[in-house]
Structure formats: C-alpha cells, structure tokens
Curated annotation (Swiss-Prot):
Pathway: Purine metabolism; AMP biosynthesis via de novo pathway; AMP from IMP: step 1/2. IMP binds at D13, E14, G15, K16, N38, A39, G40, H41, T130, R144, Q224, T239, R303. Its cofactor is Mg(2+). Mg(2+) binds at D13, G40. This is Adenylosuccinate synthetase. The lineage of its organism: Bacteria, Pseudomonadati, Pseudomonadota, Alphaproteobacteria, Hyphomicrobiales. It is found in: Cytoplasm. It comes from Methylobacterium nodulans (strain LMG 21967 / CNCM I-2342 / ORS 2060). Plays an important role in the de novo pathway of purine nucleotide biosynthesis. Catalyzes the first committed step in the biosynthesis of AMP from IMP.
Length: 430
C-alpha cells in the first residue's frame, strides 16, 4: 500500500478534481500542500457539482480527514466563505473533518491589494495572477514577517507581528502611492475572524506522521500544474510556490519517504491561463474548437484558457522533475472527430532540435514546436469505461503519448463523470 501524490503535469486545469475525488474515496486523509485559493477544483458527485479552491477535495467525502498543510497560504475570510457555501450544499465541515497547519501563512487584505496593484499598474509587467494575494503572502513568508495561523491565538504577539509586517508594507505602499494600512484596524479584523479559524488549527506534521505510522492511506492533493512551479516552471510566468511532487513532503511536514506513488494528471491536449510562453498554442479555428468542446474557462476567475496541441516535450520534463510514476490522461473525448492530431515531440531553436523547454525566458519565447501528425478518429470515446470501448486510433494516440513522455497511463478519463474512467493501475496498490 502506498501513499499517493497527485500533481498537475502541465499548466494546471488538467482535470485533477475528478481524479482526486476518485482517489479520495479510497483515502483516509487528503492533504493540500501548496498554493492557496488561486486554483479551482470542480467535482461532480451524484449529479451535484462542487467547486473548491482552498479546501481539500476530501471534504465532500464522509469519513475522510482533510488537511491544509503548512505549504498552503490561507485566506481566512475566503476559507470561512467556502465552508459556508459548501454547507448550503449539504456538506458539513467541522474540526473533526478539517485540520489546518498552525504554522501556515495567512493571506491578508494588504496582500490582495498589492497583488491587484501590480497586475493592473503596468500591462507590460503583468504576470497573469488571480489577484488574490498569493504571491505577496509567500513573499512575507520568505521574508520572515508573515502572520501565521497560530499567531491568531495571542493578541499581544499578533500586535507586535503586525507592527513588523507594516514597517515593510507601509514603506512599500508609500513608494507606490497607495494608502497606508492601519495596524489597529488590521488587528481588529484578524481577532474577529480568529474564533472561526483557530478550532481547525493543529500540529499537522505530527498528525500526519501518526497517520502514516498507523498505515492510513494519505492522498496529497496538488493544485495548479508543475509548469507553474516557481523553480521548474516557465519563470517568471509561474505561481509563487513549488508544485512538483517533492513539495508534498515539505508542504505537509513529512519526510520524502512518505510520498509514495506520484500520479501526474495530463490533459490529452494543452491549455494555459494567463501570460507566458505556450509553444503549441493554437490561435485558429482548431484552438477555438478545442476550447469550446472542453469548456475551457477557469473555475476561479472565469478566464478563457488558451488551447493547443499536446506537448510531449513539456510533459516529459515534468515526469522527470516530479518523479512521476504514472499518469491519469483526461479529456480524451474532446479530440473525437479530428481528422488528424498533432503531438509536439521537441523544439527547434536557432536551427537546433532540443528535447526540453530551456530556462531562458527569451529562448522560451523563440522555440518552435516540432510536430508529428497522427490520424484522428471519428468514433466517440466519451463515456468509455474499458479499452475495448475505445477506437483503435485513440488507443494508438494514448500509446504514443506514453512512449514520448516516458510514463504509462494508470487511469484514463473519458468524461467529467467519475465512473467514466478506465483503470489500468490503482496508485494506492503500488
């Protein structure tokens, strides 16, 4: 029996929600280990759609403990709202079903304001964030001035920490021409929300270590995609946290040996939200067709996603940087009916063929995709639950992806419904 880490292997929006829900039904504990409420998950269970952005997917499953790890930045006001919204759908969340790391960093209103200012002040410098304060909160964490969950329990210490925090932020805001933050007002806001957050606070690293030693199945739920990783992604058009599988250990307080099986979620084509390089992007009618069929709009922002052909070079890179053992291939049905389909196998840069996306921002913008073209299929793959139900050419496409990325398919998803899944290998049984 293995613990399982789920990571997006592209730029996010790969369909992790459905796969995580399928795995969460088998897990005892589901852990979020990075990011914040900037990445949405959509779950469809018995005809009901649940949209999550901060809470682990396990919250909609009775009998499963959900954990927000220390690697997550937590907006306490959003957390309260998300819990209330799920409550209206019949999902009850209590301290018995949800734990939050007491050493997790808080997102404050000043973080959201700074994020929004940076994204709107100069269009040429825009990264394409969700403007929800994620990046500025991580900056304060690394700068050793962050307010953490545990600080809400000590009013005197909280006041001192706010003073230290504002010594930095108000100097910055003066330089930017933004109104300064009143420390007393911020303290009042935090003390008001504290009673709704502190009951969930716990020493998460100890809780998870106990669960591991007891042989409980732990599912580590990644948000976004590894190509947005602050180190291994398309920098600077990335998020502000590490997303690769190794972060599951750091962001939860467990050792690397606790990770177990790494499952990469891979869409059968490629999408991206926001700015940044996208070698296989299709700006023509084909790209529009893929986007319309795949309903490619962000869960959190509603932004239209950019669409393109499958990029095997990028996914192969992620397989290596995350140590992916197997993949879950999603949205194969969106490619039904295409006469031909292209797969990017590498790039052309200055007359040379390279097999990975270079680190240089300038080179990333200049690479040209090298494609191979395969025949498509006209039969439907939607709703298939066995290999026998798939068209031969669709199987050929899947097998070619496996060859090019160096990882095998463990699960194949053919619709948003959780049961429309072809299981090849259960990651928990590795």
């Amino acid at each position: 029996m293995a613990n399982v880490v789920v990571v997006g292997a592209q730029w996010g929006d790969e369909g992790k929600g459905k796969i995580v829900d399928w795995l969460a039904e088998q897990a005892d504990v589901v852990v979020r280990f990075q990011g914040g409420h900037n990445a949405g998950h959509t779950l469809v269970i018995d005809g009901t759609t649940y949209k999550l952005s901060l809470l682990p997917s396990g919250v909609v499953r009775g009998g499963t403990l959900s954990v927000i790890g220390n690697g997550v930045v937590v907006d306490p006001w959003h957390l309260v709202d998300e819990i209330a919204r799920l409550g209206q759908q019949g999902v009850t969340i209590t301290p018995e079903t949800l734990r939050i790391a007491d050493n997790a960093t808080l997102i404050l209103p000043l973080h959201r304001e700074l994020d929004h200012f940076r994204e709107t002040a100069n269009a040429t410098l825009r990264i394409g964030t969700t403007k929800r304060g994620i990046g500025p909160a991580y900056e304060d964490k690394v700068g050793r001035r962050a307010i953490r969950v545990v600080d809400l329990a000590d009013a005197d210490l909280l006041g001192a920490k706010i003073e230290r925090l504002l010594a930095h932020h108000n100097a910055l805001r003066r330089g930017l021409g933004i109104e300064e933050v009143d420390g007393a007002a911020l303290k009042t806001e935090l003390l008001a929300i504290a009673p709704r957050i502190l009951p969930f606070a716990d020493t998460v690293w100890a809780l998870l270590d106990e669960a591991r030693r007891a042989g409980r199945r732990i599912l580590f739920e990644g948000a976004q995609g590894a190509l947005l990783d602050v180190d291994h992604g398309t920098y600077p058009y990335v998020t502000s946290s590490n997303i690769v599988a190794a972060q599951a250990a750091t962001g939860s307080g467990l050792g690397p040996s606790a990770i177990g099986y790494v499952l990469g979620i891979v869409k059968a084509y490629t999408t991206r939200v926001g700015e940044g390089p996208f070698p296989t992007e299709l700006t023509d009618a084909i790209g529009e067709k893929i986007g319309e069929r795949g309903r490619e709009f962000g869960v959190v922002t509603g932004r239209k996603r950019r669409c393109g052909w499958f990029d095997a070079a990028l996914v192969r890179q992620t397989v290596r940087t995350s140590g992916i053992d197997g993949i879950a291939l999603t949205k194969l049905d969106i490619l039904d009916g295409f006469e031909t389909i292209k797969i990017c196998t590498g790039y052309r840069l200055d007359g040379r063929i390279i097999d990975h996306l270079p680190a240089s921002q300038a080179d990333q913008a200049r690479v040209e995709p090298v494609y191979e073209t395969i025949d498509g299929w006209f039969e439907t793959t939607a709703g298939a639950r066995s290999w026998a139900e798939l068209p031969a050419q669709a199987i050929k496409y899947v097998r070619r992806i496996e060859e090019l990325i160096g990882a095998t398919v463990a699960l194949l998803s053919t619709s948003p419904e959780r049961d429309d899944t072809i299981l090849v290998h259960n990651p928990f049984e590795d």
